């Protein structure tokens, strides 16, 4: 598969493997990767050396690798780091899609670099890469209201209304991936943050 090198060469969607976690808010990043595979005709394959399910797709002529780490959220950096090292992908060319409790359900925000905000998947990726200089695609799943309820909240399934909002957000995010690969960050932000 030959394609142009896009601004982002690796898109990682974070989540937890296994049927116990399928459909939970914490797996929003997995859902985005699944949507990109569906849209662009890829096939996710288990890649033990990369610690995840991986696909390679052409998106508007841009060659892009997708990964769903199968290491559980707290060790997501193992998959992202392995792919980045093997394919010589710098942190600036990595986009990480993840659930975000500080955004309401259905909202999407792009962010370059920054802290992990308490998100263990981001924390591990940042530690593995040795830098926070990767981009994030934040998929809002809402906050439960109290910090003691955060873990049960993200590890549970959204309500039917929240699920519809989250699915719409994932569609909106997937619509902007070609722009992001083309380096049109500001335009994608305008569309998603409006």
From Swiss-Prot:
It is found in: Cytoplasm. It catalyses: an N-acyl-L-alpha-aminoacyl-tRNA + H2O = an N-acyl-L-amino acid + a tRNA + H(+). Its EC number is 3.1.1.29. Keywords: Cytoplasm, Hydrolase, RNA-binding, tRNA-binding. The keyword Metal-binding does not apply. GO terms for molecular function: peptidyl-tRNA hydrolase activity; tRNA binding. The record marks 16 as: Discriminates between blocked and unblocked aminoacyl-tRNA. PANTHER family: PEPTIDYL-TRNA HYDROLASE (PTHR17224:SF1). Monomer. This is Peptidyl-tRNA hydrolase. It comes from Halorhodospira halophila (strain DSM 244 / SL1). The lineage of its organism: Bacteria, Pseudomonadati, Pseudomonadota, Gammaproteobacteria, Chromatiales.
């Amino acid at each position: 598969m030959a394609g142009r090198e896009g601004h982002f060469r690796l898109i990682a969607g974070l989540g937890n493997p296994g049927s116990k976690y399928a459909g939970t808010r914490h797996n929003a990043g997995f859902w985005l990767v699944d949507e990109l595979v569906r849209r662009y005709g890829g096939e996710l394959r288990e890649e033990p050396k990369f610690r995840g399910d991986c696909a390679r797709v052409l998106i508007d002529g841009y060659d892009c690798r997708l990964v769903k780490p199968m290491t559980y959220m707290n060790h997501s950096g193992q998959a992202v780091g392995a792919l980045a090292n093997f394919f010589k992908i710098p942190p600036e060319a990595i986009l990480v899609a993840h659930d975000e409790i500080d955004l309401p359900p259905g909202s999407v925000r792009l962010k370059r670099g920054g802290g992990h905000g308490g998100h263990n998947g981001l924390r591990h990726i940042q530690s593995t890469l040795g830098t926070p200089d990767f981009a994030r695609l934040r998929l809002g799943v809402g906050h439960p209201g109290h910090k003691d309820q955060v873990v049960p909240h993200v590890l549970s399934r959204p309500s039917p209304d929240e699920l519809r909002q989250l699915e719409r957000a994932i569609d909106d995010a997937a619509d902007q991936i070609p722009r992001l690969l083309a380096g049109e960050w500001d335009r994608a932000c305008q569309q998603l943050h409006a």
